[in-house]
């Protein structure tokens, strides 16, 4: 898979945080590159699992909390997406409500298994609400539980799919902690600056709207191509190589039009004027990592 060299990306601070929310986002921690765990099998033979941060769950499962909920749900591979619900309250959930595969790409993974791109899609996916700033417990409590359950299910590689801006930080921290505990990960990100700061292992960047790491709604061929590219590009990262953030060669609009940036801003604007969900959620995130990254990585092994 050839990656793009275009340097354009969606700047959440400039497009949303300042003009719409009227508040600066918390400083994003800047980590050193993570150490990688060797992937034991080629992708075509590996069992690949998902870790999504959109808070996907099913009606017979307990709903997750809106913020700092360190629990997760296991989503069986055979459960139809017509039943899935989303506990994450971010305005960009509108995309996932239109097509769950953009945030929880279960159908995409089953298609990649059928096509022989991956050896097998795991029996279940892990799902959290990624609006988390309790980073110590996320790394030392949640990550070990996920690793234990993933290894018991013979998962060889975990694809981490962050959703909102806070998900990109929490998901990156979680991916680093999981990798450090011996389970290879790769992350499919849509916030370039945040991913470049947190440095999740084997990350790739897709210049698509927040909330759509798995592709455009109702475009299954594109969704398969994106997730395949993310997996194949991610696993090509060599242990010991310099960390990088390859840009996947896909555009939201065929002509390259970036009107989707205004759509994302409008989703936040409507929420801010009617519900105030984002600002209320931001007020709950008092734990910050910026300035104490080295101490955190030593303390929490990530």
Label for each model-derived stretch:
Residues 2-181, 185-235, 242-302:
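Metallocofactor- and cofactor-centric catalytic cores in central/energy metabolism, strongly enriched
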């Amino acid at each position: 898979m050839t990656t793009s060299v275009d340097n354009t990306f969606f700047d959440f601070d400039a497009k949303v945080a300042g003009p719409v929310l009227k508040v600066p986002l918390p400083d994003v921690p800047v980590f050193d590159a993570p150490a990688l765990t060797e992937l034991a099998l080629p992708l075509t033979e590996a069992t690949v699992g998902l870790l999504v941060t959109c808070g996907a769950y099913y009606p017979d499962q307990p709903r997750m909390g809106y913020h700092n909920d360190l629990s997760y749900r296991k989503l069986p591979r055979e459960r139809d997406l017509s039943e899935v619900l989303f506990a994450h309250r971010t305005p960009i959930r509108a995309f996932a409500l239109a097509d769950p595969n953009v945030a929880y790409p279960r159908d995409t993974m089953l298609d990649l298994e059928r096509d022989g791109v991956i050896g097998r899609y795991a029996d279940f996916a892990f799902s959290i609400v990624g609006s988390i700033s309790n980073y110590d417990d996320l790394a030392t409590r949640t990550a070990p539980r996920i690793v234990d359950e993933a290894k018991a299910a013979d998962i060889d590689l975990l694809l981490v799919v962050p959703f909102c801006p806070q998900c990109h930080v929490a998901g990156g921290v979680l991916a680093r902690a999981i990798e450090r505990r011996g389970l290879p990960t790769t992350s499919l990100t849509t916030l370039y600056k945040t991913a470049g700061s947190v440095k999740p292992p084997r990350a790739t960047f897709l210049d698509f709207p927040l909330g759509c790491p798995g592709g455009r709604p109702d475009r299954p061929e594109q969704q398969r191509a994106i997730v395949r590219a993310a997996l194949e590009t991610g696993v090509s990262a060599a242990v010991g190589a310099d960390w990088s953030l390859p840009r996947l060669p896909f555009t939201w609009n065929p002509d390259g039009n970036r009107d989707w940036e205004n759509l994302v801003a409008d989703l936040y604007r409507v929420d801010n004027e009617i519900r105030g969900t984002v600002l209320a959620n931001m007020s709950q995130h008092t734990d910050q990592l910026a300035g104490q990254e080295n101490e955190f990585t030593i303390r929490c092994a990530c």
